[in-house]
């Protein structure tokens, strides 16, 4: 427990840095939460018209997820079997905490983004090869349907299965459970998108006119 608490706290705080909010406030003197869906992620930052800031938000949100996992990996490399647990759990646990930080940032009254970019960084740090496959799936879905939300949902759902298929017994069962929980969180945060996909009212990409409540 003494091992997991500081890792959880640091990873959460790293993930909770609201780069989209900060960049829009800094460069546009505006509150991105007052635009489009009110989300702080890259998709909503793009709705401000600042495409460069949207790309930077995407990159920084991914980097913070990667950093959380990398820092946990460095930690277990320097400590001999901390807390007598399987050390392979710790990077995945840190990644989950970073995603939670992005979804529920303490700085913004626990109202954050949908976690796709942060999860990308986390998953890239945990298992780079599966990320290539999952990104291919995302790109294919968006290319065929023009729904970014659908691509994100399916990519998140596929990741733990792709990891298991490629690595089988290289990770303990708890690690796959943590990866699965991370994916479920992302899908849960897209529940309004799922409702619009079912209703046929979800915006396509590129959309000619943003719709309130979009991801």
UniProtKB/Swiss-Prot annotation:
Query: Which domain of life does the UniProt lineage start with?
Result: Bacteria
Q: Which family does it belong to?
A: Belongs to the PlsY family.
InterPro entries, per database record: G3P_acylTferase_PlsY
Q: Does the keyword Mitochondrion apply?
A: no
Per UniProt, what is the membrane topology? Multi-pass membrane protein
> What functional role does this protein have?
Catalyzes the transfer of an acyl group from acyl-phosphate (acyl-PO(4)) to glycerol-3-phosphate (G3P) to form lysophosphatidic acid (LPA). This enzyme utilizes acyl-phosphate as fatty acyl donor, but not acyl-CoA or acyl-ACP.
Q: Where are the transmembrane segments?
A: 4-24, 56-76, 90-110, 122-142, 147-167
Reactions that this protein is recorded to catalyse? an acyl phosphate + sn-glycerol 3-phosphate = a 1-acyl-sn-glycero-3-phosphate + phosphate
Q: Which gene encodes it?
A: plsY
Q: What is this protein called?
A: Glycerol-3-phosphate acyltransferase
Identify the pathway.
Lipid metabolism; phospholipid metabolism
Q: Which GO terms describe its cellular component?
A: plasma membrane
Q: What Pfam family is a match for this entry?
A: G3P_acyltransf
Q: What is its EC number?
A: 2.3.1.275
State where the protein is found: Cell inner membrane
Q: GO: which molecular function terms?
A: acyl-phosphate glycerol-3-phosphate acyltransferase activity
Q: Name one GO biological process term.
A: phospholipid biosynthetic process
Q: Which UniProt keywords apply?
A: Cell inner membrane, Cell membrane, Lipid biosynthesis, Lipid metabolism, Membrane, Phospholipid biosynthesis, Phospholipid metabolism, Transferase, Transmembrane, Transmembrane helix
Describe, as the record does, how this protein assembles with itself and its partners.
Answer: Probably interacts with PlsX.
């Amino acid at each position: 427990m003494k091992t997991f608490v500081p890792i959880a706290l640091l990873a959460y705080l790293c993930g909770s840095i609201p780069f989209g909010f900060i960049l829009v406030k800094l460069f546009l003197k505006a509150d991105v939460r007052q635009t489009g869906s009110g989300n702080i992620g890259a998709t909503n930052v793009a709705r401000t018209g600042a495409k460069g800031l949207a790309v930077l938000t995407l990159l920084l949100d991914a980097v913070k997820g990667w950093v959380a996992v990398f820092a946990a990996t460095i930690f277990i490399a320097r400590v001999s079997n901390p807390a007598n647990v399987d050390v392979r759990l710790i990077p995945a646990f840190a990644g989950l905490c970073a995603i939670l930080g992005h979804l529920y940032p303490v700085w913004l009254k626990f109202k954050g983004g949908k976690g796709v970019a942060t999860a990308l960084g986390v998953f890239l740090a945990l298992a780079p090869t599966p990320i290539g496959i999952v990104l291919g799936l995302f790109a294919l879905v968006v290319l065929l349907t023009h729904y970014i939300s659908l691509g994100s949902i399916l990519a998140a759902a596929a990741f733990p299965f792709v990891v298991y298929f490629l690595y089988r017994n290289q990770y303990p069962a708890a690690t796959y459970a943590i990866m699965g929980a991370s994916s479920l969180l992302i899908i849960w945060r897209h529940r309004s998108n799922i409702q619009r996909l079912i209703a046929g009212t979800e915006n396509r990409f590129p959309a000619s006119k943003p719709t309130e409540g979009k991801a």
